[in-house]
């Protein structure tokens, strides 16, 4: 017998009834809503002031000390890359399931799988995305798909409403509020999700057909503390221009070599912004994503590690559109690097607590992955310029800054270290069997200059406008 007007029955959740800023409200210490604490600001100002005084009083000794420290940092980063790439060869670096293993599961009852697709002003991608998700090899009645659209995004809403949505698909309108970010929209979708598992896809994504089934098998065959499995990402327009060639080489190295290596080492995984599959319950326990962090994926990967969970890599690919326009790429990379800066400051508010929760080894992984990569992008131009001045002009002043051991280590990093980083991109191309891109990977140092420019742009933006979300423009693939 049904109960009418049961006062204990919870009202159904709606987009306007849930709190998309739950993390910042309940755990402000884990949110980038405050980019830096007062203590962090004080320490930063004190370090910069101390450095300025040291340069004024002891310019040559200070420069020598900084150069020696940076050289040691480069040596450590080069060796670290060696360790990570070596670990990627481990058989447990990535979870694999053959078509035969998937077919052997049938007939079976598959769990309900929630899919979140945040979009903003992308009407040209709606039809492709709906068709791609509808064609995935997963029972139609077990898909819980939400197209997350901003309530004031009239053009994309119109495009979505013009389609006949398959069963299990629905449009969720996100009320307009600050901050206007992807993670805020995803938090609303998370509260309304009904599935046992949940995945994020971007508007232009083309996931492989059996990806959802592989994700289910990955969770079912992994230890209980595996809360996320990350699919590999790559691009379907690698040969559009030189920028997409460089971008594809970088992604191949990152998702096919470096992330599997980190997973094999049990390291904290900075998640990709798409195609990460979660246990919905655990994601809800962690209060979803930080709506104020512009690389909410990276931050969530760290929070998973701090909570005692792990992430595994899954051998399945989601194909995306690589940025083919220079300024769009700069904006996207600025956002990514700014998010890494946000993430580093958030989790370094209490370094001793972070060390205790992650453990010494994972704490070191965190510093090298989140802090080290960002730092190297910022200091690279300084050392490139010094190397250029030395080789062209051979000024005596520069030579005095590099005593024997520092010069030897610096020269090794300049030649051997840079070769290693280029070689990693070459290996990524080989792994993906995109041999034609290998010649372009040799020009990676030019790509690094672009990364350094966007890195310094990210630093400025972090202090001036930390929450701005410079959206990536899609739909730029040339039609054949």
Predicted segments with their positions:
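The conserved acidic donor/metal-binding loop of glycosyltransferases
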Residues: 202-206, 289-292, 304
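Acidic donor-binding loop at a coil-to-helix junction in glycosyltransferase catalytic cores
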Residues: 294-300
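N-terminal signal-anchor transmembrane helix
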Residues: 79-142
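Cell-envelope/extracellular polymer assembly enzymes that use nucleotide-activated donors
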Residues: 111-114, 144, 284, 299
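Long helical/loop segments within the catalytic core of UDP-sugar-dependent glycosyltransferases
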Residues: 162-197, 209-294, 334-345
């Amino acid at each position: 017998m049904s109960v009418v007007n049961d006062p204990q029955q919870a009202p159904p959740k709606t987009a306007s009834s849930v709190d998309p800023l739950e993390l910042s409200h309940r755990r402000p210490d884990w949110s980038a809503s405050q980019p830096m604490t007062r203590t962090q600001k004080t320490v930063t100002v004190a370090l910069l002031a101390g450095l300025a005084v040291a340069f004024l009083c002891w310019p040559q000794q200070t420069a020598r000390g900084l150069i020696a420290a940076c050289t040691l940092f480069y040596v450590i980063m080069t060796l670290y890359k060696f360790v990570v790439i070596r670990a990627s060869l481990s058989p447990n670096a990535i979870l694999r399931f053959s078509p035969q293993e998937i077919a052997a599961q049938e007939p079976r009852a598959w769990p309900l799988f929630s899919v979140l697709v945040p979009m903003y002003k992308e009407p040209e991608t709606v039809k492709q995305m709906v068709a791609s998700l509808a064609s995935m090899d997963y029972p139609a009645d077990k898909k819980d798909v939400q197209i997350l659209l901003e309530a004031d995004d009239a053009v994309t809403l119109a495009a979505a409403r013009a389609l006949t949505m398959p069963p299990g698909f629905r449009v969720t309108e996100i009320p307009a509020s600050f901050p206007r970010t992807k993670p805020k929209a995803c938090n609303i979708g998370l509260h309304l999700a009904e599935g046992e598992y949940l995945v994020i896809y971007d508007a232009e994504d083309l996931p492989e057909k059996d990806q959802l089934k592989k994700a289910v098998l990955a969770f079912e065959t992994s230890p209980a503390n595996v809360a996320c499995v990350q699919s590999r990402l790559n691009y379907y327009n690698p040969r559009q221009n030189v920028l997409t060639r460089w971008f594809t080489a970088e992604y191949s190295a990152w998702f096919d070599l470096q992330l599997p290596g980190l997973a094999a080492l049990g390291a904290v995984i900075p998640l990709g912004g798409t195609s990460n599959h979660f246990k919905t319950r655990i994601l809800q326990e962690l209060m979803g994503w930080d709506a104020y962090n512009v690389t909410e994926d990276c931050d969530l990967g760290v929070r998973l590690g701090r909570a005692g969970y792990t992430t595994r890599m899954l051998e399945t690919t989601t194909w995306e559109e690589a940025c083919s326009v220079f300024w769009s790429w700069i904006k996207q990379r600025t956002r990514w690097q700014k998010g890494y800066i946000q993430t580093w400051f958030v989790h370094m508010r209490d370094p001793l607590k972070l060390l205790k929760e992650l453990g010494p080894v994972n704490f070191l992984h965190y510093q090298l992955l989140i802090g080290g990569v960002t730092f190297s992008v910022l200091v690279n131009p300084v050392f490139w310029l010094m190397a250029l001045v030395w080789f062209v002009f051979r000024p005596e002043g520069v030579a005095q800054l590099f005593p024997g051991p520092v010069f030897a280590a610096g020269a090794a990093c300049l030649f051997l270290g840079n070769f290693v980083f280029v070689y990693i991109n070459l290996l990524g191309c080989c792994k993906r069997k995109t041999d034609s891109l290998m010649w372009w990977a040799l020009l990676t140092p030019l790509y690094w200059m672009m990364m350094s420019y966007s890195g310094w742009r990210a630093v400025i933006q972090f202090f001036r406008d930390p929450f701005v979300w410079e959206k990536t423009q899609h739909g730029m693939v040339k039609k054949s």
